[in-house]
């Protein structure tokens, strides 16, 4: 199996330009490629892992990765399908860009990667040059037919977001001309922008050897965007989403989803993935594929030490069936791995505690879960929506373990 064929086997290729020549380049030569990340937030999500896997595989094959952080394009905003993005301030965009670069370096620390920020060149580009030199090369009808723009025409799209495609195209041309980058990677929702960049390079350069490649969007079995928990996005920043929550998410993945995730989100060799697929069919109760997936991803994003803490947390939560079996040292660990809320109050309403620890998004939702019998304090089911947590509920005079369903846990600390 060639390298390109392996990428297809891993379901990492959705679209590609000039596939025959691109296959030859990736299989037989060494090229420079890039992937862009806009700083619309200060953290990536688990949905970005497919891009990081693709970059790691290409780098392992000997190709040279560039990561472009969009300090400038983040100020404009890629058109969303349903509504206009809220504009970020320059300060926020640049700070987010710095945070993303730090996060990416930590995750990909063993890779030789060149980091660039497009604010460096766009901040030097004046509006007249932009319109005369580049604006004349983009046909409005061509842009209107692009999927991201077409979906917004009925609801309306600002000129600001309409120009995003041009800016991303200029990025590709800038990297192609100044750094010799031949390939742009992106999610399938970026394919229109990628092909616009290829078209711009063709118009501006006498010879064009540029290529585009898109990866499938990661979707759950029900077709929804992968990486969403019940309440929110699963962030890679441990301050926004606990590593244990990420670990649990993948550990509890459905059998019909896990093999594809092993292909798209890990560097586990094909032979091992096929063995795990076989095990999932023959002994699904052992969840060997889910364990391998969760272990690999947590180790990639964080560290072996964090992975060990996740294992230990599972032991503490699921072996201690009775409240009195917990040790005080267990809560030192849980305070680190679970989402916890510490208060100086002597009591707190259960509905408020559920919101504070992100087990629910609102008090109304919290009350509904309580009334349905889905909430426990340690192993005591609570059905009173007006229940008040106080010292009677604590262990070691301050710790209260909250449970929603069988798999969601958080900690309240009454000091």
Curated annotation (Swiss-Prot):
Biological processes annotated in GO: tyrosyl-tRNA aminoacylation
GO cellular component, one term: cytosol
Annotated S4 RNA-binding domain residues: 348-414
Pfam families attached to this UniProt entry: SYY_C-terminal (PF22421), tRNA-synt_1b (PF00579)
InterPro entries tied to this protein: aa-tRNA-synth_I_CS, aa-tRNA-synth_Ic, Rossmann-like_a/b/a_fold, S4_RNA-bd_sf, SYY-like_C, Tyr-tRNA-ligase, Tyr-tRNA-ligase_bac-type, Tyr-tRNA-ligase_bac_1
Ligand binding (ATP): 228
Gene Ontology molecular function: any one: ATP binding
Motif 'HIGH' region per UniProt: ranges: 39-48
Position of sequence motif 'KMSKS' region: 225-229
Keywords annotated in UniProt: Aminoacyl-tRNA synthetase, ATP-binding, Cytoplasm, Ligase, Nucleotide-binding, Protein biosynthesis, RNA-binding
Gene3D superfamilies cross-referenced by the UniProt entry: HUPs, RNA-binding S4 domain, Tyrosyl-Transfer RNA Synthetase
EC number, UniProt record: 6.1.1.1
Location within or outside the cell: Cytoplasm
PROSITE patterns in UniProt: AA_TRNA_LIGASE_I (PS00178), S4 (PS50889)
Ligand binding (L-tyrosine): 34, 164, 168
EC class: ligase
Catalytic reaction list: tRNA(Tyr) + L-tyrosine + ATP = L-tyrosyl-tRNA(Tyr) + AMP + diphosphate + H(+)
Membrane-spanning parts: none
Function: Catalyzes the attachment of tyrosine to tRNA(Tyr) in a two-step reaction: tyrosine is first activated by ATP to form Tyr-AMP and then transferred to the acceptor end of tRNA(Tyr).
Family membership: Belongs to the class-I aminoacyl-tRNA synthetase family. TyrS type 1 subfamily.
Oligomer status and interactors: Homodimer.
Name of protein: Tyrosine--tRNA ligase
């Amino acid at each position: 199996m060639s390298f390109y064929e392996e990428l297809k086997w891993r379901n990492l290729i959705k679209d590609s330009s000039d596939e025959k020549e691109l296959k030859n380049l990736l299989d037989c030569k060494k090229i420079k490629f890039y992937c862009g990340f806009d700083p619309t937030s200060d953290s990536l999500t688990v949905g970005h892992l497919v891009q990081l896997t693709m970059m790691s595989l290409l780098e392992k094959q000997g190709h040279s990765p560039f990561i472009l952080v969009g300090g400038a394009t983040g100020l404009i905003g890629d058109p969303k399908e349903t509504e206009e993005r809220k504009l970020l301030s320059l300060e926020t965009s640049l700070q987010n860009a710095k945070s993303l670069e730090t996060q990416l370096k930590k995750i990909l620390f063993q890779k030789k990667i060149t980091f660039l920020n497009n604010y460096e060149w766009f901040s030097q580009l004046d509006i007249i040059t932009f319109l005369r030199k580049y604006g004349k090369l983009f046909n409005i009808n061509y842009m209107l037919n692009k999927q991201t723009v077409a979906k917004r025409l009925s609801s309306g799209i600002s000129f600001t977001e309409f120009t995003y495609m041009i800016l991303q195209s200029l990025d590709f041309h800038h990297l192609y001309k100044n750094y010799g980058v031949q390939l742009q990677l992106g999610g399938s929702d970026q394919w229109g922008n990628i092909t616009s960049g290829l078209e711009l390079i063709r118009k501006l350069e006498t010879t064009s050897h540029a290529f585009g490649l898109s990866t499938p969007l990661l979707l759950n079995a029900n077709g929804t965007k992968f990486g969403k928990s019940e309440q929110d996005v699963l962030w890679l920043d441990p301050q926004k989403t606990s590593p244990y929550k990420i670990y649990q998410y993948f550990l509890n993945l459905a059998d019909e989803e896990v093999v594809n995730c092993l292909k798209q989100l890990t560097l586990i060799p094909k032979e091992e993935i096929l063995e795990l697929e076989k095990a999932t069919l023959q002994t699904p109760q052992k969840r060997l594929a889910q364990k391998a997936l969760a272990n690999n991803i947590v180790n990639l994003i964080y560290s072996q030490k964090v992975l060990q803490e996740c294992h230990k947390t599972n032991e503490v939560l699921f072996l201690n069936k009775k409240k009195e079996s917990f040790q005080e040292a267990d809560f030192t660990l849980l305070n680190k791995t679970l989402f916890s809320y510490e208060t100086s109050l002597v009591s707190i309403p259960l509905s408020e505690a559920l919101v504070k620890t992100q087990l629910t998004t609102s008090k109304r939702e919290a009350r509904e879960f309580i009334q349905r019998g889905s909430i426990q304090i340690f192993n005591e089911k609570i059905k009173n929506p007006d229940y008040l947590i106080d010292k009677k509920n604590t262990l070691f005079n301050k710790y209260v373990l909250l449970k929603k369903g069988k798999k969601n846990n958080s900690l309240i600390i009454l000091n």
